[in-house]
Amino acid sequence: VGRPNVGKSTLLNRLVGEKMAIVSRRPQTTRTRITGIKHLPHAQVVFVDTPGLHEGTGRLGELMVRTAERALQDVDLVCLVLEATEKPERLDRAIFERLKGARVPVYAVLNKIDLVAPKSKLLALISACRAAFAFKEIVPVSAESGENCERLLALIVAAMPQRPPHFPRESLTDQPETFWVAETIREKIFRLTNQEVPYACAVRVAEISERKRPECLYIRASIFVERDSQKGILIGKGGATLKRIGTTAREDLERFFGIKVFLELTVAVRRNWRTDDRALKEFGFLLTS
């Protein structure tokens, strides 16, 4: 868990060793709970990436925060990801308050140490963290470069209770294929569009099927926005933006599935879907309890 844009998704991808979560420089890219499974010779660790803890605005923002908070109740260990570049006096005390009710060990993971020089600057932040909360461990890492991530993984494994594996060894996640297709498309939207457009987009995958002639995986998906102006921006002049989104998403999906992919994308307007419980449930965001 952690504030938006502190590198939680990059860290998940690094620890699992596969791309499990979409990554963007914009905050609040992750909207739902994402599970990644790390298989080791002597252990299986199930990681849960959550939306950033923030003051949720609007119905979708509220649900994202509830998803993150609910994840705290279902795990054996919590890693609070903080930016190593944060000044000690600017540490967010509110997030420590949210963690006081945690019934499991909490680690502070100080991410982005590759941006800190000299490393001695970390000492003040580590001291501030110790004074603010009873962390079981404080681990400086760089999810981007991988520095110290092996040590973090070892500390996580050591803290895990012994129980039978939850998943088969070939499993990397418990999410369906449609989820990963939608997330891949959404990542490209975040990277190739600006301002409010990526936040106003939802992706629904209507079909994934194998085709014989030519042999490929056929995927049909729709991107929903809230206004006609957003639709125009997403499509772009002569369809150029939508084509780039489709091409870059298809390339990632071909690597993911290991087969040629034909990706058909359409754009539709679903007005105010972020405040509509029916639409949120349709797009997989609404919690049922």
Language model features with spans:
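Conserved glycine(s) of the Walker
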Residues: 7, 148, 241
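Conserved, well-folded catalytic cores of nucleic-acid-processing
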Residues: 14, 18, 37-41, 56, ...
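Catalytic P-loop NTPase motifs of RecA-like helicase/translocase cores
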Residues: 30, 54-55, 87-88, 116-117, ...
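Solvent-exposed alpha-helical segments within well-ordered globular domains of core cellular machineries
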Residues: 13, 32, 36, 66-73, ...
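Conserved G1/Walker A P-loop phosphate-binding module
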Residues: 1-77, 82
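P-loop NTP-binding site
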Residues: 177-289
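Conserved C-terminal guanine-recognition region of P-loop GTPase G domains, centered on the G4
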Residues: 38-44, 63-138, 209-214
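Canonical P-loop GTPase G-domain recognition
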Residues: 104-107, 114-173, 177
